A protein has these predicted regions:
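Beta/alpha (TIM)-barrel catalytic core signal, keyed to glycine-rich beta->alpha loops juxtaposed to Asp/Glu
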Residues: 1-178
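Conserved small/polar residues in nucleotide/adenosyl-binding loops
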Residues: 183-189
């Protein structure tokens, strides 16, 4: 696979290689192969949000930092759960009701709603919307270089851009986010909980 990607770059069909959904050890192997092939590799795309912190547990985030490779986070708002969209129930025009492929009604449990409300309160205390805080949190340490957001309205894009105005978090804020997001999950070694 790395050979095919290198071939695409060397033939001029692509400028750089980007990978998707690798864990830390696999990223390290891929980077070594691409380096040997003298092929520029710059980015890895993975799902990442306050509710899905797999890249912290599988070593990808630490490996990307060590190798100085970027990460593009997709689904940073957890399919809309990390917005104010579902705070008062499931709207009829919501993704859950109209599509259901990526976000199912069963995902919005009472326990999840409690977490969303806790995070919403924390965001309000920071002077941000929940979506702004969720995006700011992803960008807080400079390891994730970009986020992919889906917007159904232009104003959602403008609101999401506001996230970059406040990417600083106190230790207490990070601890609270960790406490909410790691309920029933295995903690990574760098957790503050």
């Amino acid at each position: 696979t790395m050979g095919a990607l290198a071939s695409a770059v060397q033939s001029g069909k692509a400028l750089y290689v980007g990978l998707s959904n690798y864990d830390g050890p696999t990223l390290e192997k891929a980077e070594a192969i691409l380096r040997d092939l003298k092929c520029p590799f710059v980015i890895n795309q993975n799902r990442y949000s306050i509710f899905d912190r797999t890249i912290e547990k599988n070593g990808l985030k630490d490996t990307a930092k060590k190798l100085e490779k970027g990460i593009i986070a997709f689904s940073p708002l957890a399919q809309g759960l990390l917005t104010d969209r579902y705070l008062k129930g499931i709207p009829e025009d919501s993704r859950i009701m109209t599509d259901g492929r990526f976000l199912k009604k069963s995902a919005l449990t009472e326990e999840k709603l409690v977490k969303i409300r806790e995070l919403n309160g924390l965001a309000a205390g920071r002077g941000q919307t929940l979506a702004e805080m969720a995006l700011s949190w992803i960008l807080k340490d400079g390891i994730v270089t970009s986020v992919l957001v889906g917007a159904s309205k232009p104003e959602q894009i403008l609101d999401n851009i506001k996230a970059i105005q406040n990417t600083e978090f106190t230790e207490e804020e990070l601890r609270k986010i960790d406490a909410v997001s790691y309920t029933h999950l295995t903690l990574p070694t760098n957790s503050r909980v």
